[in-house]
Amino acid sequence: MRQSRTLIPTLREVPADAEAKSHQLLLRAGFIRQNTSGVYSYMPLANKVIHKIQSIVREEMEKINAVEMLMPALQQAETWQESGRWYTYGPELMRLKDRHGREFALGATHEEVITSIVRDEVKSYKRLPLTLYQIQSKFRDEKRPRFGLLRGREFIMKDAYSFHSSAESLDETYNDMYQAYTNVFTRCGLNFRPVIADSGAMGGKDTHEFMALSDVGEDTIAYSDQSSYAANIEMAEVKETDAGEQAEMKELQEVHTPSVKTIEEVAAFLGISPSDCIKSMLMKADGRFVLVLTRGDHEVNDVKVKNLLQAEIIEFASAEEVAEITGTEPGFVGPVGLDREIEIFADFAVKAMANAAAGANKTDYHYQNVNISRDAHNVTFADLRFIQEGDPSPDGKGTIRFAKGIEVGQVFKLGTRYSEAMDATYLDENGRAQPMLMGCYGIGISRTLSAIVEQHHDDKGLIWPLEVTPYDLHILALNMKNDAQVQLAEKLYEEFKANGYDVLFDDRAERAGVKFADSDLIGLPIRITVGKRADEGVVEVKIRKTGESFEIAADELFDFIEKQVKSLSSHS
């Protein structure tokens, strides 16, 4: 492609509202342009990268017998109502009405649509297993779109769905898809980790996220420093530890604590450590009130609470609800003397606490010497807190460390979550109707593009891995008024194209400095500069990743480039 004939609108300055490095560079290098908040156009270079990523995905899907199809982005409300998610998905689902008043949603995901299709078309176990996938735009009304393509309101996604007659078959496809995703992200040049994750609004169980490591990532990964264990911090398990010898229980004592509400204030007022305080939180799980307890220096993990209670929606009670249920205000709530109808769920660490401080369910008062086993009723103990750096790894090997990650893919075992709700059944060998077992597997195509940029850049611009680069070679003719340079550059351009290379030829009437700056910013793997030694048949070759440059005779250039490409391929 001749650069004079395409659209690559590079910028010299960093856009003021671009926070993430990938957002800055994709704007500056002319890959994307914002249309409105969270919505972007993919310019020609970005579109080529998107197609490269999609090609990798398609190749890996074909290896595991997944079949591509395409479903509508516009989905009728009735299908979502069948699954129940129309009422629980939340404001992220973009809803609209047509001129007849019928309700629709713009597809945030396609479980309902694919389940309805397979339900109507597949009736026998003989047609299973079946894996179908698509690549298309998705829509989510993000409250705060940010970081460019990393969190947008419209984005490109590959989503696959598998249907099975046995758990063993689902396990096999799940493992195949896990390996396929590993292959995809490896081929894209990403430094990533598969981590144990929560299924969230998707439902189901057994899920892994694929996290591209990056400081701009919005997810925290908890990993062992001595094993392969890795989990999203929401799902990292904290094992119950032996409390050891318990201290002698002291007499419960009510203490006047005027205007002392926070754990830090209570600890300072009583002259104790936050770890000697019980943090009490009144929460609502699908409208049902529960009291959740953690140690004062720990943070409650609402995902663990939600999963324990098998709730669709979990939220903190309002100040008015706290007053109605406990008779006090937030900051003075506690487990002692609470209405027996309110179930108490306490983190394992609370079980090991002796003579702790806790709210007295009375404004401006706390209890000292609280011992849960003696002083509270109707208590269930479970793992309810976020893991912390320095905690033992759940697999018993090493210590937990944290890293930030960008979620680029996720695989789920949905089980019968959707098939039962939507009556998607098949007839088994005995002619009995059985609900299909399902799996769901997603890759953020546009997010993967941004993740690649986050990991592959320097202060001059992008550095594209070979397999996803928009073009293999960048040929620069420094002076388009010099016949020798133009003729040699044209000759090389045609020869490399004829030999299967994807080439960008900078034939613009621009200064050499502009061409070099744009070339570094765009970041193609290999640059061939036709300059002052063109009349001698000598060109300069520069490797973008390493910065190495070589002067090569034009008649030796093809073999030299072949070797460089092989070298880049082996080190990608």
UniProtKB/Swiss-Prot annotation:
Domain of life: Bacteria
Enzyme class, UniProt record, top EC level: ligase
Keyword ATP-binding attributed: yes
UniProt keyword annotations, A-Z: Aminoacyl-tRNA synthetase, ATP-binding, Cytoplasm, Ligase, Nucleotide-binding, Protein biosynthesis
Family annotation (PROSITE patterns): AA_TRNA_LIGASE_II
InterPro entries from the UniProt entry: aa-tRNA-synt_IIb, aa-tRNA-synth_II, aa-tRNA-synth_II/BPL/LPL, Anticodon-bd, Anticodon-bd_dom_sf, Pro-tRNA-ligase_IIa, Pro-tRNA-synth_IIa_bac-type, Pro-tRNA-Synthase_IIa_type1
An individual GO BP term: prolyl-tRNA aminoacylation
Subcellular location: Cytoplasm
GO MF annotations in UniProt: aminoacyl-tRNA deacylase activity; ATP binding; catalytic activity, acting on a protein; proline-tRNA ligase activity; transferase activity
A cellular component annotation (GO) from this entry: cytosol
Catalytic activity: tRNA(Pro) + L-proline + ATP = L-prolyl-tRNA(Pro) + AMP + diphosphate
EC number: 6.1.1.15
Chief location category: cytoplasm
Subunit record text: Homodimer.
HAMAP family named among the record's database cross-references: Pro_tRNA_synth_type1
Family assignment from sequence similarity: Belongs to the class-II aminoacyl-tRNA synthetase family. ProS type 1 subfamily.
Chain's role: Catalyzes the attachment of proline to tRNA(Pro) in a two-step reaction: proline is first activated by ATP to form Pro-AMP and then transferred to the acceptor end of tRNA(Pro). As ProRS can inadvertently accommodate and process non-cognate amino acids such as alanine and cysteine, to avoid such errors it has two additional distinct editing activities against alanine. One activity is designated as 'pretransfer' editing and involves the tRNA(Pro)-independent hydrolysis of activated Ala-AMP.
Note on domains (UniProt): Consists of three domains: the N-terminal catalytic domain, the editing domain and the C-terminal anticodon-binding domain.
Identification of the protein by name: Proline--tRNA ligase
Source organism of the structure: Bacillus licheniformis (strain ATCC 14580 / DSM 13 / JCM 2505 / CCUG 7422 / NBRC 12200 / NCIMB 9375 / NCTC 10341 / NRRL NRS-1264 / Gibson 46)
Gene behind this protein: proS
